[in-house]
Amino acid sequence: MNNFKYILFDLDGTITDSGEGITKAVQYALKHFGINVEDINELKKFVGPPLRDSYMKFYNFDEEKATEGIKVFREYYEEKGMFENSLYDGIVDVLKALKKSGKELIVATSKPEVHAKKILEHFNVDKYFTIIAGADFEETRVKKGDVIKYALDNLRNTLNDNEVLNLSQVIMIGDREHDIIGAKENDIKAIGVLYGYGDVVELTQARALKIVSSPEELREILLP
C-alpha cells in the first residue's frame, strides 16, 4: 500500500488524543443547559464528529439550542480545552518517516481550522503538513466529506498546470466512521485506526480499506 502519495490525516483521535479537552468542554456546555454529566467518559462519543450533530443526536437539541451549545463549548475550549490534549505515542515518528519518504501530508478535520492550526503549532508538528484543512466558524464546511473535498481542492491548487490529481494516490486516515464515509464520498480510500475513539465494528461497517491498531502499524502499511 505504499503507492499512496497524498495522505490525509484526521486530527482528533488520530494525531492527538484530544478527549480530555473536548469532553470537559462538552460537560461545561451541557451544565449551561442544566444537564449534569459527572463522568466525562460518557462524553467520549463527542470526540471526532461535528459538534452540532452530536448535540442533536445524543441530547435531542434543535438547531437553535445546538448553536448555543457550540458557543458555550468554545468558551471553555478556547481558554483551556484546546491544550488539554497530547500527541499519540509514535505518531511523530510516523509523520517524520512519511515526510522523509516524499509523501505529501494533509490534515482534514471537522475541528475549526483555526483551532487545528493552533494545536498542530503547539505540538510543533505543523511543519509536516502541506495543507491544514478544517471546518469554518460559519459552519458551511463541517461535515467530513465537505472538509475532505476542501482539502482536495486545496491540494489541486498546489499542483502544476499540467498535473492532474490522481485520486487513486490519495488515502484518508481516521478513527471514526465519518472519516471513512467522508473519504468514500470523495472517491478516495481510507484506513481506520483503533487507537483513537472508534472501534472495529464501527470502522468495519463503514468499510475501511484496512484497520490498524497503532501508529507503528500504520507506518508499516504506508511505507515500503
Regions found by a protein language model. Name each.
Residues 114-171, 177-185, 200:
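Substrate-recognition "cap/lid" segment bordering the active-site pocket of phosphatases
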Residues 1-45, 59:
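Active-site neighborhood of HAD-like aspartate-dependent phosphohydrolases
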Residues 56-93, 101:
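Metal-dependent phosphoesterase signature
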Residues 29-30, 50-63, 119, 147-155:
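Helix-loop "lid/cap" segments that line or gate small-molecule binding pockets
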Residues 124-132, 202-222:
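Structural recognition of alpha->loop->beta junctions
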Residues 172-212:
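Acidic, Mg2+-coordinating phosphoryl-transfer loop and its flanking beta/alpha structural elements
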Residues 26, 94-120, 129:
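Substrate-recognition element of Asp-dependent hydrolases with the DxDx(T/V) motif
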